[in-house]
Design a protein with these regions (language model features):
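Flexible inter-domain linker/hinge segments
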Residues: 1, 5, 95-172
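Generic beta-strand/beta-sheet core signal
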Residues: 2-4, 27-29, 57-59, 79-81, ...
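ATP-dependent adenylation/nucleotidyltransferase module used to activate substrates
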Residues: 6, 129, 152-224
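CN hydrolase (nitrilase-like) catalytic-core segments centered on the catalytic cysteine
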Residues: 8-96
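Hydrophobic positions within alpha-helical membrane elements
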Residues: 11, 86, 106, 191-193, ...
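Composition- and surface-driven signal marking solvent-exposed, interaction-prone regions
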Residues: 14-16, 40, 89-91, 112, ...
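Short acidic (Asp/Glu) and glycine-rich catalytic loops that position anionic groups and cofactors
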Residues: 25-28, 141-146, 173, 177, ...
Length: 224
């Protein structure tokens, strides 16, 4: 067993567990939700299961987690030797399960001689290196959070909207209050209204519980 951010460290405890013979590794996590984090999380789990020739079960906290300014999606993943066997839908409910072929994993480890003979010590080799100025050729995206592909962009926007709406939904359920949103005409207040509507939909509440107050300012125009 390892806990949450253990998986994100340079030397996760699961490495020692696998070298000691563990074939099923479990991560009890409380990973908050951020834009694009689900893909990175999925790659970590899949990669670690492949590297260690093991099954990796990742169980993250859901919306029942006590929180103030974080949102938890309940993202659960079961991977076996690099293959995702099962994955839950974020912000969903229910139990995730799958069959794990432990005997197959053990057989693969027996064939992988380097896994058995792996030495946990390291060797230092000193060498000289001449530092030269190198021209950078890597493309740096000026808008890294906005996918160029329309389908991925729409998915990203919906993800952002859902993360914010789930946070507000939890607060609305806790207080039982209605919502008052100030509308200045800018993008921020427009997004706030859209998030509020989505949160009310998730709660199954009537939109009449939302009061939008126009707050025109010096930048307000007919287009606004």
């Amino acid at each position: 067993v390892e806990l949450c951010e253990d998986l994100w460290t340079p030397n996760p405890p699961s490495i020692s567990h696998a070298l000691a013979g563990a074939s099923v590794l479990v991560n009890l996590s409380a990973s908050n939700e951020l834009t694009g984090k689900d893909s990175y999380r999925r790659e970590l789990v899949s990669g670690q299961s492949a590297r260690l020739l093991a099954a990796y079960i990742y169980a993250s906290a859901g919306e029942g987690e006590s929180t103030q300014d974080l949102v938890f999606s309940g993202h659960n993943i079961i991977a076996e030797n690099g293959q995702i066997l099962a994955e839950s839908k974020r912000f969903g409910h229910g139990i995730l399960y799958s069959e794990i072929d432990v005997e197959r994993l053990c057989a693969q480890r027996r064939r992988m001689t380097t896994f058995v003979t792996e030495d946990q010590t390291h060797t230092e080799i000193l060498f000289s290196l001449k530092i030269e100025e190198t021209k950078l050729t890597r493309f740096i995206d000026p808008a890294p959070f906005v996918p160029t592909d329309r389908q991925n962009r729409e998915k990203r926007c919906d993800e952002i909207l859902m993360i914010q709406a789930m946070g507000l939904k939890k607060r609305l359920e806790h207080t039982g209050a209605n919502a008052v949103v100030g509308i200045s005409g800018g993008l921020d207040s427009t997004l706030a209204l859209l998030v509020t509507v989505r949160a009310f939909d998730l709660c199954g509440r009537d939109h009449k519980g939302i009061t939008a107050v126009t707050m025109p300012g010096f930048g307000t125009t007919d287009r606004t």
